[in-house]
Amino acid sequence: MAVKVWLITAILVGFGLTACTSESNELLIENVVIVSAERETAPDAMNVLIRDGVIAEISAEPIQADRSVMRIEGDGRFLTPGLMDSHHHVAFVPGMGAIGVAPARDHEALVDAYMAQQPRSLLYYGVTQILDPAPLLAWRDFAANSPGPDLFRCGEIPNGEAGYPINQRDDADMVSLYPYRITSTRTPEMVVERIAADGAICVKIYLEDGFGAESEWPLYDAEILGRIRDAARAHELPLLAHANAIDMYQIALDADVDVLAHGLWNWQWPEGDPPVAEILQRVHEQGVGYMPTHRVMAGLGEHLLPARMDAPEYADIVPADLLDWYRAGGADWFADELAADFPPDMPREEMAAIFGYGVGRVQRATAFLEQAGHPLLLASDCPGSPTSANQPGLCTRLEIESLAQAGVSPESVFRAGTINPARQFGLEARYGTVEVGKVANLLLLEANPRLDIAAWDTIQTVILHGEPLARDDLKAR
């Protein structure tokens, strides 16, 4: 037993932790610089005591604790809240699509490996909370894997069987994956009541009448949308709208939704200059939450690049067998599907560049709101499509990079991933800052992310409900 205890202690010391032999439900983090939205500047080295997974004490003075308490010597490192990705889909496998549907259902072992690694990959990139606006049924499988981010979810209301997103499925069982359908016997009020009873924290609707310039899919009319909104507010549930086109934004704003679940990248307009600035000004004036989701268009373009999965960062977070499947062309079916919309002799690199125009438009829209001082929400929409390029955690980090490229400041990025989503979704009492009484989902970094987004690459330790996790231990095995 003595040898075992010595080995455990040696391992802990290796990444700044020390502990005695008796069990404790406390963790003491000493000599850290706290970086949190409620603090205008980072104070001198502080000490933080965590008890039962919650921050119990913060002090500039040494905190007296029993010898049994595990300790982390911060050595002047930076302690921040964990990130929240406000748009992540746990039930979709990159390169395959929805779990339980072809091709995912034909690769059970690969899907199982992905589901086991997915929460660890998110933690690897500092994501300790996620919101899934459309979790289907596999959210239960995600929640069963530990360790993993705290999962919050919306109840999604599809536009009937002929509308989006059900019309994108060709499987007979797909309708059963959408339990919150409005029918002749289930009113909007009944559906929202069930969403609330099932523990969701928001309601999602789809304002999508067709991709690109298409506009043939049915939408709910203003009367139904108003009833959904009123029912959601009666249950204190924010109303999210899937929308990415100017005309769909207009409907969303007229319906007085609370959050736009995508950035504005579709600028299709019948004639004349599209009223992009006017629409974005309405977003700002109405105080609507904004999820830029730059990675949707970026991931589509990158999926067309033949060597996309050779980038070294994928090996850290993608199970080896799944990565081999990607590299062997397993996900090329989706690249071929994307390429079918282009001239057959066009190089794939040129096709990818065309998707880059959409990225540029959504970055310009995000820049408009940043300049207006509008609070943003960090939201990657991983994977956003069957693209293999958008992998859990890495997708969030790349979204941060794209926000910075759009001109979003490190401070705004920091708030977009911490305090803003906590406020938007009624979680501020438990998440979003480093304060007494908050859930101890924290990150220990080598640099200050409020000054430079590169600091997000310096995560040393992830603390999940008071449990310290060495970052390297979260890599794909």
Language-model features: locations:
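Active-site mouth loops of central-metabolism enzymes
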Residues: G100-A113, R169-E189, P238
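Histidine-rich, glycine-flanked metal-binding segment
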Residues: L27, I34, E38-T80, V101, ...
